[in-house]
Amino acid sequence: MKLAMEYPERFRIVAAADPVTVRAEQVRDFAPEAERSSIRLFANADELLSQPKLADVAIIGTQDDYHFEPAKRALELGYDLLLEKPISKTLKETLELRDLAEKLGRRVAICHVLRYTPFYNAIRNVIRSGELGEIMTFNANEGVGAWHFGHSFVRGHWGNSVKSTPMIVAKCCHDMDILYWLMDRSCEQVSSFGELSFFRKETLTEPRPERCTDWTGPIGEDPWDARKYVTDESCRRWLKMVMDGVDEATPEQITEWLKTSAWGRDVFQCGDNDQPDHLVAILRYMGGITGTFTMTAFEEGRHIEIYGTKAKLRAGAFYKENGPGEITVTEHFSKKTRKVEVEEASGGYAGHGGGDWGLVSNLYHDMREAESPMLMTTPIQASAHSHVIAFAVEHARRTGEVVDIAEFERRVLSGELKY
């Protein structure tokens, strides 16, 4: 919302809802001061959605397990939606929302921010130019980052796949979506392997307290020490997403909060975390394009290699730091390498590689100027397919099967498979 207020001629906030009052007030305070008194605040989504339609577009940014109900009610009230990913906690509900949006003629944009980044748009332009020739295969990697993984997918909201969604959906639906977008064709088959190997009690070589605040050794001696939230600014910034008032809190107040919160736990003794800390998937797309995707807690940043009949493309943080450039194209026979220029993030705002700014700046066009929902940048119709891919990868990981995407979707819709 803060970014949307950079476009006052396009956007106006009329209401906000959150069970934590200060968060709703923060949304209100993003608006120009002269408009704040007219903005209505509600205690929760139910209260807001019990009102007649208040605006053109509703933004739903609740936790993963509470997307479906408010999204469904908002669509039925006549709202177009900007919906945080994943679309819903289950694939069946995801497909139900897709079908409901089509039935009601409503526009639903999904926050797949990678589609809006200068980085991935530059890659897509290279592919569409034909410079690589026909695409044959790709390797894509997402390094979640060690502290990020421990914060979000062990201690945090997404540590348990039943309470949230499977890792490939909760985190990597961004990747499934961007690969679908880059390949520009449907995925037909997937297989996958992945395990929770490291963040479990068996990793410990000797007993220790389950809460880091009960440890007596020097802070930071163990790299996973939650007390680093107090002493290390690079760790503390993650608390801004889960602890209200952290910017004004004293070290003593943060320590007290850690004593009872999920984020004070030892990452090896959380007990309820079940997300794989490493995962690989093999994907086959229409026309025979194949690719691999790797998710790991033990690297940071995304990188990708795409191999065509004329040339190969290499891109990502690894190549920016260790090679000739963030994106390069190398011809197979001449060995000539071209560095692809990547635009700076618009407006100087680099959140999600500039994708946050891109999403907001395109929202008005997508909701009001695009001739049809399918011409939006992230329509639910396209995003739903990437969710099918992600849930199919999870099914393949659990069962060891090679999963046919169309058949998997049919079995989920029929109730034969519970996803």
Predicted regions and their residues:
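N-terminal Rossmann-like dinucleotide-binding module
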Residues: 1-36
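Short, Asp-centered acidic motifs that coordinate Mg2+ and/or phosphate
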Residues: 15, 56-57, 137
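C-terminal helical cap and adjacent loop that interface with cofactors, partners, or active-site loops
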Residues: 17, 275-419
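Glycine-rich beta-alpha junction loops
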Residues: 20, 141-146, 194-199, 287-289, ...
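Beta-loop-alpha module in the N-terminal Rossmann-like domain of NAD(P)-dependent dehydrogenases
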Residues: 37-100
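Rossmann-fold dehydrogenase core element
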Residues: 96-113, 133-140
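Predominantly a Rossmann-like dinucleotide-binding segment in NAD(P)-dependent oxidoreductases
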Residues: 114-266, 400
